[in-house]
Amino acid sequence: MATNGHFATIGVDNDKTAYEHGVQVIDENKEFNPNISKYLSLENVTPAGFNYHLISVFGSQSTGKSTLLNHLFGTHFSVMSDSERRQTTKGIWMSKNKKEGEATVDPTLRMADNILVMDVEGTDGRERGEDQDFERKSALFALATSEVLIVNIWEHQVGLYQGANMGLLKTVFEVNLQLFLKDKNTTHRSLLFFVIRDFVGATPLKNLQKTLMEDMARLWESISKPPGLESSSVHDYFDFQFYGLPHKSYQPEQFVAETKKLSLRFREGQRDPSMDARRGEFSEGGVFLPEYHRRIPADGFSRYAEGIWDQIVNNKDLDLPTQQELLAQFRCDEILREVMIAFDEAIVPFEEKQSQSARLGEPEVLGGLGAAMRSSRAKAVKNFETEASRYHKGVYQRKRAELESKVDTRLKALLQGQLNAAHKSGINEFSEAVSSSVKSGQKQGTGYDFAEIVNEEVKKAIAKFEDVARSTVVEGTTWSDYKQELALYEKELADVSGRLRREEMRRLANRVERWVQSRLGESVGLEFNALGSGRAGGGAPETGEKPLEKAFWDRVWNVFVETVLDAERRFTDRASSFDASLEEVDVGLWRLRRKSWGVLRAKIDEEMTEGNLLLKLRENFEDKFRYDDAGVPRIWRPTDDIEGIYTRARESTLTLIPLLSRFRLAETSAPPPLDRWIGHTPSSATPADEEDLPPIGGVDEEEGKSLDEEMMILSEAKRQELTVRFKKAADGVYVEAKRSAIGGMTQVPLYFYGLLLALGWNEIIAVLRNPAYFFLLFVCAVGAYVTYQLNLWGPIIKMTEAASSQALVEGKKRLREFLESSDTGRQAIAMSAGSGRSGEQYELSDLSKKGKARTSADEDMDDL
């Protein structure tokens, strides 16, 4: 490749060797190369941040600009052949300093890092002729991007206007003022470094400096200045340095030595406040001062340069602050996207897992979430700050706030999901733990303190929730305050504790109600069984006074009240361990009294069913009819007053029917004070407390029943029907008694004994006269009596039956043996067997003495 013009297509590969001669930034057709960022990346300039420097070179065409850059920076820009005079550099080219890191005699004097050199197309070339548009645009581009502008000028051109590129420098001054007008808050300062070529030393360098500075002052005075800048000086915007180089062809060794010496000037330096360019004092130190840098990060330079050139080539007013903001906007967006990709890799798995748990309705506390949230947020902010803080501060701060907002929005959602999961799982675990502890206490039978269990589990639940919250929050963020969530959690724990307490009290009430039901079932049942005991019948108590039948309901009511009072004491004592409020205890006792009345009424209705009541009435009647006042059973005789006893017993029993038909106390002849005993509905009772309670007449006004109606046990129709049925049953008992009395009159007639004596007189005398008969009769009588007293008649009879059976079997066996031993018998057996084979065969079962098939048990009995 001989000339730079051939390099316009370079930069499409990722091979670093493709950029050996640099990269064409802008071609001769004013097109910007989009591969600048790729070149900077291959040269490892992109991550440098602000640690890079940009130099541009100006000068007339064919004055050795590319040659100068190649010697200064080791670049490989193509140079003009000595045998012809034509344009070599087309457009603007850029290359990185190749001498970076070279050893020097003085280690402190080394070239700056990441120096980028732009070789600008020469001016006053015949190829463009009168077209100076590109010259102006390239000058504006170089001034907007470069820190140092090298003006390549020959010694003999100093003092000339065209030859010394005074027109180009005038353009540079005008462009600089244009940039200043767009950004009055910042003075865009640059260094104009005049490299005087073919310097022979006849004219001292200071004189050349003076001439050039006079020309610069004249040029500055000649340009039109905006209002307020009329008195400004060129030194307000530019610094100047000068250097003379020997002739390359005539003094090649000196030229190489001086260019090497000059290259060491391209290092970072500091302004010397003691020097004043107006007095002709110019620094010979490092050329890269901090104020020259355009403060465009290396990773955004390509985008920034493209935006600058786009405005220049479209003849728009160049607005560097706007371009910097646009660049900052673009780069911050890119950095934000890159940062969010890394953030997503860390956070998305947790978001997906949390979302899946929410869909399944199975809240799960995610382990490691807090550490991942803190780490990913810190990395995202730090990485963004590292890459984006070099750009426009306003844009950076705005985009950082946007990044933090995006990150915090998602992290806040994760935190809320984590706290919700901890909330729900904590509530479930709390309920299960309380229930498990209660069941364990019930199984052990040692008792348990429900309030203590709840308090302990509440402390554990809150501690666990706070552990999850503290391990998940991100310190330093406003959304990491979980006090509200903790308050809601504590409130629901209190609600659940109250619900569990109410459920436990409800279970306690159920246990007490079952105890009341059992006690009332026994006690009231005994009272009903004692009906009629006033006559000392079957239901009478063994000792003590006989209860009066008319006080039956008094006894039932007293038993009921005492039982319920005992149950209330049990309920109150147990409820105290639940930490229940007085209102809850009042509601529980009120429900207990209502439920207990329902139990009593159900027991009464059970005892007062038609069948049970009729049986009780009959027993009461029979106690009075069949037994006397001393409780001795009556043996009816024809002389007894059966009708009178029957009438008194029946009428006495009939008085029980109206007594039992209505629940009334004997003392007051009025229903018991059920309404006062139950009491009014507590103000703290909820509809749920009342929904399972049956209405009670005289207590619940909406029921529409009075207390008298509530105490009605038997209706009038039932009473009449019961009376009729009882009378029929009593009549049956009376008829039976009558028959018994009449049956007792039957006896053997007296003449029968006389007839027996007359007919059996001879036999009686024979027995009495014969001692043997008499003794035998006496022995048999004594033996029979002894056998009866010893209860041996059964075994004797069984032994007799067994002996007779055995004798029968033995007789059959002997008969068969006898028949088989004689000829006649054998013929008979043969005939019997033949007839049996020719006809049907039947199997005969061995029967017991009762005519049933004999079993193994019968055989065992036979063996006995």
UniProtKB/Swiss-Prot annotation:
Gene Ontology CC annotation, any one: endoplasmic reticulum membrane
Keyword Membrane carried by entry: yes
Biased composition regions of type Acidic residues, renumbered to the chain: 688-701
CDD domains: GBP
Topology feature Cytoplasmic, residues: 1-747, 793-864
Residues in coiled coil: 480-506
Compartmental location: Endoplasmic reticulum membrane
Pfam families cross-referenced by the UniProt entry: RHD3_GTPase, Sey1_3HB
Chain positions covered by the region annotation Disordered: 675-701, 830-864
Sites where the protein binds GTP: 59-66
Gene3D superfamilies: P-loop containing nucleotide triphosphate hydrolases (3.40.50.300)
Membrane topology: Multi-pass membrane protein
Signal peptide: none
All residue ranges annotated as the GB1/RHD3-type G domain in the record: 49-305
Side of membrane Lumenal, spans: 769-771
Gene Ontology BP, a term: endoplasmic reticulum membrane fusion
Keywords: Coiled coil, Endoplasmic reticulum, GTP-binding, Hydrolase, Membrane, Nucleotide-binding, Transmembrane, Transmembrane helix
GO MF: GTP binding; GTPase activity
E.C. designation(s): 3.6.5.-
Highest rank taxon of the organism: Eukaryota
Stored InterPro entries: G_GB1_RHD3_dom (IPR030386), P-loop_NTPase (IPR027417), RHD3/Sey1 (IPR008803), Sey1/RHD3-like_3HB (IPR046758)
Job of this protein: Cooperates with the reticulon proteins and tubule-shaping DP1 family proteins to generate and maintain the structure of the tubular endoplasmic reticulum network. Has GTPase activity, which is required for its function in ER organization.
Family to which this protein belongs: Belongs to the TRAFAC class dynamin-like GTPase superfamily. GB1/RHD3 GTPase family. RHD3 subfamily.
Record protein name field: Protein sey1
Protein source organism: Neosartorya fischeri (strain ATCC 1020 / DSM 3700 / CBS 544.65 / FGSC A1164 / JCM 1740 / NRRL 181 / WB 181) (Aspergillus fischerianus)
